[in-house]
Amino acid sequence: MEQVELIPQWYVAPVSVKDEAVVRNLKAKVKALGFDNEILDVRVLKEREVIEEVFSLKSGKLPRSLKNTAFTKWFVLDEDRYLKVKISEKNLLGRYIYIKMIYSEDAWRIIRNFPGITGIVGSSGRGALPTPLDQADADNLEQMLKGISVNPKKRVLVTNTAIVEMDADKFDEKCQYILKHKQVKPEAIAQVNESGEIIDTNQFAQALMEANKAEQDEWNEDVAIVKSEANKVDPSVLIPYLGKYEIVEGDTKVDQLQQFSVGNLVEVHLTGAIHIQGQIKALYQGTINKAVVEVELTTKTQLINLPLENLSFIEVEQSH
């Protein structure tokens, strides 16, 4: 008897809970049961969207916090306006996921009995078999799994659980939001890898402390905080190697600090290859004008003390 070749096909399944959680848990279940030769892949098809909103200091609607997160970024447009970039991802099919499998009763039983999955499109529950995607849609899905969109104006990011499509004019080849940066090449104080990431954050932090300590000797003892987030700043939250200073209460302002302000989102220039985003928390005027900048190193938020010449505003590429 001639053996019939079993060809895997893509199916669509509705889910009742968070889609990526179902995908992740189902993949783990399939592997644990040894069915990964029948249920070959599970994915969510998503679209990444960008919402841009401009806030003005003069309008009084500036949010209390300008902190960057994984999906929210803040940028300075000018001395009065800030740009909030919110990145979101949504399921293109609503509450549906894609499942690639070689149909069998056992594989089908695993799928339909899995928590969070309410069935497969085409199956009525009365003995009707699920309906696979037509060949054209299946081919498109396979192409996207290779990181290639069927739409030339789109880019594709493939993760362990999802296929994420996004506008090519908003995201670069690495699927990072497109920004226009100023580039400078100050003295290197940290080793970086090919991606520009710090190799040893402890070494980096130590280098910063040593660099700032050497410069601190040149400071006057009457260095003052000329502008801060609050009228009073607790010295214990600042960097311990800032030296002696006095806290100036009220909204004292010095105009000659290269137009930097507390709350500005800036780029910290460390080497010719690495640029870290941070937020100004306080400004100082002394022998050398400096700023206290909050940056994130791995998962830890730190305050670092840097000369203003090592900072620059982040410029956003404007569309005309």
From Swiss-Prot:
Superkingdom assignment: Bacteria
InterPro entries in alphabetical order: NGN, NGN-like_dom, NGN_dom_sf, NusG-like, Transcrpt_antiterm_NusG, Transcrpt_antiterm_NusG_myco
Protein name: Transcription termination/antitermination protein NusG
Alphabetical GO biological process terms: DNA-templated transcription termination; regulation of DNA-templated transcription elongation; transcription antitermination; transcription elongation-coupled chromatin remodeling
Record-linked SUPFAM superfamilies: N-utilization substance G protein NusG, N-terminal domain
UniProt source species: Mycoplasma pneumoniae (strain ATCC 29342 / M129 / Subtype 1) (Mycoplasmoides pneumoniae)
Alphabetized NCBIfam families for the sequence: NusG_myco (TIGR01956)
Organism ancestry: Bacteria, Bacillati, Mycoplasmatota, Mycoplasmoidales, Mycoplasmoidaceae
Encoding gene per record: nusG
Keywords annotated in UniProt: Transcription, Transcription antitermination, Transcription regulation, Transcription termination
Summary of the function given for this chain in its UniProt record: Participates in transcription elongation, termination and antitermination.
A GO CC annotation given for this chain: cytosol
Pfam annotation, one family: NusG
Transcription regulation is among the record's keywords: yes
Family membership noted in the UniProt record: Belongs to the NusG family.
Coiled-coil regions listed: none
